[in-house]
């Protein structure tokens, strides 16, 4: 089933989890959070790091957005930013959406 990404309650009801073999962690040598995978590493920017840190296989996309909105209430496009991150992460096989 294909979901429309932006403002789609069905999409936001999905739960992201890191794809098998992929791991989110802080990498001191990079001074940044990264996604490690068998073939390499992806260095994340600050926004992606905040989102990635909330991916635990239990929170839905909507719950991640709600938590970030509590922390950053003055960012109206935050939900769309999270949607965009999830879309890219899914396309690049960093995460699975269940």
Swiss-Prot record:
One of its GO terms (molecular function) is quinone binding. The keyword Lipoprotein does not apply. It comes from the Bacteria. Keywords: PQQ biosynthesis. InterPro entries: PQQD, PqqD_bac, PqqD_sf. Pathway: Cofactor biosynthesis; pyrroloquinoline quinone biosynthesis. Pfam families: PqqD. Transmembrane segments: none annotated. GO terms for biological process: pyrroloquinoline quinone biosynthetic process. Belongs to the PqqD family. Monomer. Interacts with PqqE. NCBIfam families: PQQ_PqqD, PRK02079.1. HAMAP family: PQQ_syn_PqqD. Functions as a PqqA binding protein and presents PqqA to PqqE, in the pyrroloquinoline quinone (PQQ) biosynthetic pathway. This is PqqA binding protein. The gene is pqqD.
């Amino acid at each position: 089933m294909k979901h429309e990404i932006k403002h789609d309650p069905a999409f936001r009801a999905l739960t992201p989890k890191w794809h098998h073999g992929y791991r989110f962690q802080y990498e001191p040598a990079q001074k940044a959070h990264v996604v490690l995978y068998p073939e390499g590493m992806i260095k994340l920017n600050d926004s992606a790091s905040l989102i990635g840190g909330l991916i635990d296989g239990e929170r839905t996309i909507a719950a991640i957005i709600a938590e970030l909105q509590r922390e950053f209430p003055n960012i109206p496009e935050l939900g769309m930013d999270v949607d965009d991150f999830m879309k890219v992460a899914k396309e690049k096989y960093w995460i699975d959406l269940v």
